[in-house]
Curated annotation (Swiss-Prot):
The gene is petA. The main subunits of complex b-c1 are: cytochrome b, cytochrome c1 and the Rieske protein. This is Ubiquinol-cytochrome c reductase iron-sulfur subunit. Belongs to the Rieske iron-sulfur protein family. Binds 1 [2Fe-2S] cluster per subunit.
């Protein structure tokens, strides 16, 4: 038995129905939140794959630094004019993994070489400025890379890989 006046105004029963439904929705969302949020990667996982920025200004000509990105060592070399000229004078066809120096550096920033510092033979960490080619020398099995990170001698099958990177400014790069 409803009258016209009670249909326009909500009853106490309507209020309790809406309040109970809202409380159940909030409680259900609060109960489900931990299950949904645990599917997201944690902060260390996100940070491990995140791009990193490296300031190049403290690296003197002829020096290298090693940084880590995604758990891998990255060598950043500030090459001298002599190293660049020697790398470009190499007959690319004579290399085990033919690749020109120009293909391994960014145009306009030829003095900077950025490579992943893991030997392509068995995964050892090469030493910078060692070996016969003033590049990288793998102490495990003797692979020798030139100043452009190209394999020149030894059992390694390929050049040191170049990670994805870009110049943010003249003195800063972003790796990743």
């Amino acid at each position: 038995m409803t009258t016209a006046s009670s249909a326009d105004h909500p009853t106490r029963r309507d209020f309790l129905f809406v309040a109970t439904g809202a409380a159940a929705a909030v409680g259900g969302a609060a109960a489900l939140w931990p299950f949904i949020s645990q599917m997201n990667p944690d902060a260390s996982t996100i940070a491990a794959g995140a791009p990193i920025e490296v300031d190049l200004s403290p690296i003197a000509e002829g020096q290298d630094i090693k940084v880590f990105w995604r758990g891998k060592p990255i060598y950043i070399s500030h090459r001298t004019k002599k190293q660049i000229d020697e790398a470009r004078a190499v007959n690319v066809a004579s290399l085990p993994d033919p690749q020109s120096d120009e293909a391994r550096v960014k145009s306009g920033h030829e003095q900077w070489l950025v490579v992943i510092g893991i030997c392509t033979h068995l995964g050892c960490i090469p030493i910078a400025h060692e070996g016969n080619y003033d590049g990288f020398f793998c102490p495990c099995h003797g692979s020798q890379y030139d100043s452009s990170g190209r394999i020149r001698q030894g059992p390694a099958p390929a050049n040191l890989p170049v990670p994805p990177y870009q110049f943010v400014s003249d003195t800063k790069i972003q790796i990743g």
